[in-house]
Amino acid sequence: MKWSEISIHTTEEAVEAVSHILHEAGASGVAIEDPAELTKEREQQYGEIYALNPDEYPAEGVLIKAYFPQTDSLHETIAGVKSSIDVLPSYDIEIGTGNITVNEVNEEDWATAWKKYYHPVQISDTFTIVPTWEEYTPSSPEEKIIELDPGMAFGTGTHPTTTMCIRALERTVQPGNTIIDVGTGSGVLSIAAAKLGASSVQAYDLDPVAVESAEMNVRLNKTDDIVSVGQNSLLEGIEGPVDLIVANLLAEIILLFPEDAARVVKSGGLFITSGIIAAKEKVISEALEKAGFTIEEVLRMEDWVAIIARNA
């Protein structure tokens, strides 16, 4: 079978939104070529450094590659992807050039091409994200492994916003806590919460592809006795109280439900949220405070922030 590799040149800010659009359109695999990765060390447990080829990365911006089977409707699929991307600036998401190119690849090439971008990555003192096809042995009894299949949906769990959310969970989750993960995507935050000792995690996403991906990853990590996954729009119809809510979403989406978060999380409970570009920190903080939260801590990584807020 022949496959088409669709490459989109965009910005770091738009990576998650564009990746989501591609998965929604039916991509069978997505790879992200971000030149920022060239300055990061990726160490294996035996001290080797992953060698990344600068020639495979754009000089500026981010290149997102998605793989689609060649069908008679491919042109319509690409047109739909372009239309969805063109709408992003209306949500204050800068898309850069947004240029789209299409190349033909053989099945044996696409099946492994995108995997070269994914390796075990230690994202905190506690957690290492490991792709399912990699063999990895923890370096200490304290190290916790989260296995993910990034070919299914919604990235590898190593984006700065995901990393900060996991680090915030490490600081705040107490054994026996009840937690809701809004916009779960791959399920990585729910899995982390379960491995940190939560007694119950409800993971929700509006996208059925995300629900399927999260369910698979939850089972893969043997946390399905703690994490339940369901389809839902934000916190609509969800009853509390719970100890903690975590939401790694676009800033524009976060602004839709601070009041619902205050309703569902118990008094004195926490709301951890990210997906927030630094320029939008103030508007998110103000919305949370208006809903009755107190900002306890702001984590920063590259151009992104995560906020830990406590309910009144």
Curated annotation (Swiss-Prot):
| Primary location recorded for the protein, binned into one broad class | cytoplasm
Q: What is this protein called?
A: Ribosomal protein L11 methyltransferase
Question: By its UniProt entry, which SUPFAM superfamilies does this protein fall under?
Answer: S-adenosyl-L-methionine-dependent methyltransferases
Q: Which UniProt keywords apply?
A: Cytoplasm, Methyltransferase, S-adenosyl-L-methionine, Transferase
What gene, per UniProt, encodes this protein? prmA
Q: What does this protein do?
A: Methylates ribosomal protein L11.
| Gene Ontology molecular-function annotations | protein-lysine N-methyltransferase activity
Catalytic activity line of the entry:
L-lysyl-[protein] + 3 S-adenosyl-L-methionine = N(6),N(6),N(6)-trimethyl-L-lysyl-[protein] + 3 S-adenosyl-L-homocysteine + 3 H(+)
Name the Pfam families on file.
Answer: PrmA
Q: Is-annotated flag, keyword DNA repair?
A: no
Q: Report the EC code(s) recorded for this entry.
A: 2.1.1.-
Q: Does the keyword Transmembrane helix apply?
A: no
UniProt record similarity statement: Belongs to the methyltransferase superfamily. PrmA family.
Q: Which organism does this record belong to?
A: Bacillus cereus (strain Q1)
Which InterPro entries does the protein's record reference?
A: Ribosomal_L11_MeTrfase_PrmA, Ribosomal_PrmA_MeTrfase, SAM-dependent_MTases_sf
The UniProt entry, under Gene3D superfamilies, shows: Vaccinia Virus protein VP39 (3.40.50.150)
Annotated S-adenosyl-L-methionine binding sites: T162, G183, D205, N248
Its subcellular locations are:
Cytoplasm
Source domain of life: Bacteria
Which Gene Ontology cellular component annotation is one that this UniProt entry carries? cytoplasm
GO biological process entries? methylation
